[in-house]
């Protein structure tokens, strides 16, 4: 279900009164007054004799002047009402844009793709000659397929980002993996101590097989000052999905601003899509998270998003987006079938791509049975914000 947004009431400004028409009416009133004066003075109409000649002669002009002032007052009130409603609508739109523009700051990110493909090459469109995996791929070295070694690779990939984190802020770890066992947390702690000796884990550690992309929305609603590491590790897909390894260090915008944390990218508030109403939802999304209209490209995690590209392009026409259907890219092309962590894998890839391309991109994410859309933008490393 998409965002429930009630738009402010507005009104069309009617056409302004015709000044020429009112001048003509004033002329007619003046002529009528002159005729009444002549009729009264000549005693041609005895019934007019009971009236004061000057009041009688001036009454058409006075009546016209009264109606002219009344029409001007009514028009002024209509204009004032229109301006008030317009300002209210603009203010409401600004508030919605601020709400939709809240983000999780990406303090560090990495993703391991097969065959030497890098996010840098994808961002620069240099990955066209790389092998395309639209099925399954097992790309981890057989010697490094233990959970301990893969945990070490994931932690080492964000080593520079971890080193810059303030020690006073709680650091939570969420491991999304298909290799979880009873001693998995112990192995993680051992890998952590090996790579980050002397740096204590100050927050919680949780392990799960899937993490909904709706976690971002919940994280933005939660006013807790902490930092989260999300580690995606897939190596047991067999015939269902491909290997994957990615890491994201995230925190909410208020934490990034309070501690002036440099960040490479921003994941803006995602919108849960109602797929039967996909076109309408995309229109609402583009009206609300307006920076999405400036995105240079569109990326999705699974190839099944192809079925919705026509509706996507139709919804975007009125918003003048620069998207071209042929340039919509798919994570599955580079990594094979993404699996349960597809949304987070795409988020990690787009964070890297945004850092390289320095332009916002639109992401279409699959998380279980849910579908999301969000904008990934440059972070404080590329602009004055944050």
Where in this protein do the model-derived segments appear?
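Conserved "HGTGT" condensation-loop signature of ketosynthase/thiolase-family condensing enzymes
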Residues: 1-225, 234-239, 246-386
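A short, small-residue-rich loop immediately preceding and capping a beta-strand
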Residues: 229-231
């Amino acid at each position: 279900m998409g965002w429930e947004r009630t738009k402010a009431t507005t009104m069309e400004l009617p056409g302004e009164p015709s000044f020429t028409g009112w001048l003509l009416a004033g002329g007619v009133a003046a002529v009528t007054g002159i005729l009444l004066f002549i009729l009264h003075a000549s005693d041609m109409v005895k019934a007019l004799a009971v009236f004061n000649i000057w009041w009688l002669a001036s009454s058409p002009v006075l009546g016209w002047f009264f109606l002219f002032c009344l029409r001007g007052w009514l028009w002024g009130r209509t204009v004032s009402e229109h301006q008030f409603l317009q300002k209210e609508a603009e203010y409401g739109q600004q508030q919605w844009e601020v709400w939709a523009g809240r983000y999780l700051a990406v303090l560090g990110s990495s993703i391991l793709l097969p065959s030497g493909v890098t996010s840098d090459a994808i961002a620069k469109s240099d990955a066209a000659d790389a092998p395309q995996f639209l099925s399954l791929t097992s790309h981890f070295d057989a010697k490094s397929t233990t959970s301990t070694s893969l945990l070490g690779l994931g932690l080492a990939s964000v080593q520079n980002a971890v080193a810059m984190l303030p020690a006073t802020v709680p650091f939570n770890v969420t491991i999304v993996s298909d290799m979880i066992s009873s001693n998995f947390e112990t192995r993680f702690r051992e890998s952590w101590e090996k790579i980050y000796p002397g740096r204590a884990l100050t927050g919680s550690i949780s392990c799960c097989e899937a993490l909904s992309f709706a976690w971002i929305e919940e994280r933005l609603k939660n006013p807790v000052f902490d930092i989260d590491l999300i580690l995606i590790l897939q190596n047991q897909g067999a015939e269902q999905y491909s290997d994957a390894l990615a890491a994201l260090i995230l925190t909410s915008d208020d934490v990034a601003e309070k501690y002036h944390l440099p960040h490479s990218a921003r994941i803006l508030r995602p919108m849960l899509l109602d797929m039967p109403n996909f076109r309408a939802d995309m229109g609402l999304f583009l009206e609300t998270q307006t920076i999405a209209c400036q995105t240079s490209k569109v990326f999705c995690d699974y190839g099944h998003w192809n079925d919705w590209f026509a509706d996507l392009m139709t919804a975007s026409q009125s918003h003048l987006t620069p998207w071209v259907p042929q340039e919509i890219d798919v994570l599955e092309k580079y990594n094979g079938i993404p699996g349960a962590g597809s949304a987070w894998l795409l988020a990690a890839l787009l964070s890297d791509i945004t850092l390289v391309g320095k332009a916002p991109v639109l992401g279409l994410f699959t998380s279980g049975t849910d579908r999301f859309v969000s904008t990934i933008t440059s972070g404080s490393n590329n602009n004055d914000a944050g």
